[in-house]
């Protein structure tokens, strides 16, 4: 498929002379989506006592901003989304890039591959670290999503499960960055967590933030989740004719396989502020028909 959307609404800078806030909702541009969707269904077994069905779906989608007329001066990114602290945003739109890309500094690492706290690349080579050294890196949307469900029946028994995968989505681990901030209350612990930063570089009796918005905190949040597993048993003419039903047990949010460092890789906003994790649940149920 191919789809182009125009007059998209997003927050954009407003002229100071307007008398309104410095940001406001505007129709700022156009976006195109290209991709493919595939759905497959199989029934490998269909006999008197056995029945087995498998359903699979696959989606690939790529989006790209094609226009940001009137708000992107000189092709600079348009910041969007919520603040990750009191004043900074980490998501941005720019023509030629995917929507909601991460706008970050490039982290510097030592010879052992460990990040040097507060040290980022001077990308424009002017000798100063400014906003101009930030760049667009990855985005929050997964280009590939997949789903797999299956149901197996044997006489009165039934068993089913649902799996879901998201591949290529990224999350800004803001909780990880926040834990690296330096303050007078936490200064004693810094050598334990940051062995590559000398103690004499810290400021005593003051809040001093050396942590920056870098690509180190933009983490691959691809995942495979088992949304539910159900086991059931159906009965007919129990005790009296016409009295039927089904008893079942369902487990939800069974497991998650991911390399993401946070509690849950499925962060819709793309910014992880230590979200409340989805709980595992177990349900017993009984359906009666008479």
Task: Give the positions of each predicted feature.
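Outer-membrane beta-barrel and related beta-rich outer-membrane complex signature
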Residues: 8-13, 60-83, 169-192, 196, ...
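Transmembrane beta-barrel outer-membrane domains
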Residues: 29-33, 139-143, 219-226, 275-279
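Membrane-embedded beta-strands that build the outer-membrane beta-barrel scaffold
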Residues: 34-44, 52-60, 146-152, 157-165, ...
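Conserved small-residue
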Residues: 26-32, 36, 43-140, 259
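Extracytoplasmic gating/loop element in the C-terminal half of outer-membrane beta-barrel translocons
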Residues: 166-251
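Membrane-embedded beta-barrel scaffold of Gram-negative outer-membrane proteins
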Residues: 1-19, 50-54, 59
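C-terminal beta-signal and terminal closure region of outer-membrane beta-barrel proteins
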Residues: 25-33, 79-114, 186, 192, ...
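Flexible, solvent-exposed coil segments and beta strand-coil junctions
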Residues: 11-23, 123-131, 202-215, 261-268
């Amino acid at each position: 498929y191919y789809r182009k959307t125009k007059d998209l609404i997003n927050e954009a800078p407003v002229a100071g002379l307007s008398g309104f806030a410095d940001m406001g909702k505007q129709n700022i541009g156009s976006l195109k989506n290209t991709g493919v969707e595939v759905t497959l269904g199989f029934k490998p077994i269909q006999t008197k006592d056995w029945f087995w069905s498998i359903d699979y779906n696959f989606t690939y989608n790529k989006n790209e901003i094609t226009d940001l007329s009137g708000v992107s001066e000189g092709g600079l990114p348009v910041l969007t989304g919520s603040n990750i602290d009191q004043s900074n945003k980490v998501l941005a739109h720019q023509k030629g890039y995917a929507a909601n890309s991460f706008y970050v500094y490039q982290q510097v690492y030592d010879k052992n591959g460990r990040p040097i706290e507060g040290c980022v690349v001077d990308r424009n080579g002017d000798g100063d670290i400014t906003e101009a050294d930030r760049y667009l890196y990855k985005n929050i949307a997964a280009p590939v999503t997949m789903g797999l469900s299956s149901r197996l029946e044997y006489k009165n028994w039934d068993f089913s499960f649902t799996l879901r995968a998201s591949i290529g989505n990224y999350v800004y681990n803001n909780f990880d960055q926040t834990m690296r901030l330096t303050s007078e209350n936490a200064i004693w612990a810094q050598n334990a967590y940051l062995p590559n930063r000398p103690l004499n570089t810290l400021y005593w009796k003051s809040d001093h933030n050396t942590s920056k918005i870098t690509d180190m905190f933009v983490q691959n949040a691809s995942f495979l989740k088992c949304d539910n597993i159900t086991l059931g048993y159906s009965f007919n003419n129990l005790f009296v004719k016409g009295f039927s039903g089904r008893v079942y047990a369902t487990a939800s949010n069974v497991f998650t396989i991911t390399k993401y460092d946070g509690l849950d890789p499925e962060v819709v906003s793309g910014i992880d502020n230590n979200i409340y994790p989805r709980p595992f649940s177990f349900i017993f149920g009984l359906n009666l028909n008479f």
